[in-house]
């Protein structure tokens, strides 16, 4: 059994086993982010859904108002003038069949792949390469579109795709630990509002089960769900 480091033991003792209010929890998250790099702020939300049923699945996107704190590398598969349009809009890579061939060879130096609709038949063969990495373009995630500029702008600003896993848990980042508490709170509230707005139609009764946040190397901190949800529904 792996030994728990003294650093981990020390920070774990600072977290009480109770729901925290948002600002209090975020201050604690920042205090306990003591790694030698800027940690990511993560949210882990357990929902009372059974994703084996189509009407209880949750998969959607949102734009974090304060961004992710991460530099997103974007590749675009398009043709003709759309390639120049993509590069002018800030794409890091853009091409047609040449880019597809590079991806087939394992060149995946990007975080998000956007494609124009006319290129989807050609991209279909990349399913085995992109699918397991969550990089396959799809209309639902906003990565298949003719409006290349808008898509690039949104993902550069902090657009994320999230889904509930087979256990009904949503795992999503909401910034970096060097963000201000106010900015982290704004992003976290956006996450909560998006999950409520996109409540699956098949869910009856209670929806939220638990709401935890943590930093990359930090302990889990339980949030008071009612504090966030009351702001929306009061």
From Swiss-Prot:
- The protein's name in its UniProt record: Large ribosomal subunit protein uL1c
The record's section on PROSITE patterns has: RIBOSOMAL_L1 (PS01199)
Alphabetized SUPFAM superfamilies for the sequence: Ribosomal protein L1
- Assigned keywords, A-Z: Chloroplast, Plastid, Ribonucleoprotein, Ribosomal protein, RNA-binding, rRNA-binding
Read off the InterPro entries from this record. Answer: Ribosom_uL1_bac-type, Ribosomal_uL1, Ribosomal_uL1-like, Ribosomal_uL1/biogenesis, Ribosomal_uL1_3-a/b-sand, Ribosomal_uL1_CS
Report the function annotation for this chain.
Binds directly to 23S rRNA. Might be involved in E site tRNA release (Potential).
Under Gene Ontology molecular function, one entry of this record is: rRNA binding
Q: Which family does it belong to?
A: Belongs to the universal ribosomal protein uL1 family.
- Identify the domain of life: Eukaryota
Q: Which Gene Ontology terms of cellular component type are present? A: chloroplast; large ribosomal subunit
**Subunit relationships:** Part of the 50S ribosomal subunit.
User: Where's it found, cell-wise?
Assistant: Plastid, Chloroplast
Q: Does the keyword Ribonucleoprotein apply?
A: yes
User: Would I find Hydrolase among this entry's keywords?
Assistant: no
The record's Pfam families line, in alphabetical order, gives:
Ribosomal_L1
Q: Name one GO biological process term.
A: translation
């Amino acid at each position: 059994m792996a030994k728990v480091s003294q650093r981990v033991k020390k920070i774990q003792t600072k977290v009480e086993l109770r729901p925290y209010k948002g600002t209090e929890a975020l201050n604690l998250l920042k205090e306990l982010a003591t790694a030698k790099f800027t940690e990511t702020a993560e949210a882990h939300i357990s929902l009372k859904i059974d994703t084996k049923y189509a009407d209880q699945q949750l998969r959607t996107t949102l734009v974090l108002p304060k961004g992710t704190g991460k530099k997103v590398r974007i590749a675009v598969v398009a043709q003709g003038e759309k390639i120049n349009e993509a590069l002018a809009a800030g794409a890091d890579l853009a091409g047609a069949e040449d880019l597809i061939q590079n991806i087939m060879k394992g060149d995946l130096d990007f975080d998000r792949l956007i494609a124009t609709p006319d290129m989807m038949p050609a991209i279909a063969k990349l399913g085995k390469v992109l699918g397991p990495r969550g990089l396959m373009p799809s209309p639902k995630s906003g990565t298949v579109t003719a409006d290349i500029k808008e898509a690039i702008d949104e993902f550069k600003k902090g657009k994320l795709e999230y889904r509930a896993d087979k256990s009904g848990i949503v795992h999503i980042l909401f910034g970096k630990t060097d963000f201000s508490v106010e900015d982290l709170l704004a992003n976290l509230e956006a996450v909560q509002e998006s999950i409520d707005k996109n409540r699956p139609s098949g869910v009856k009764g209670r929806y939220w089960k638990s709401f935890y946040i943590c930093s990359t190397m930090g302990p889990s901190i339980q949030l008071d769900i009612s504090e966030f949800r009351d702001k929306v529904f009061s």
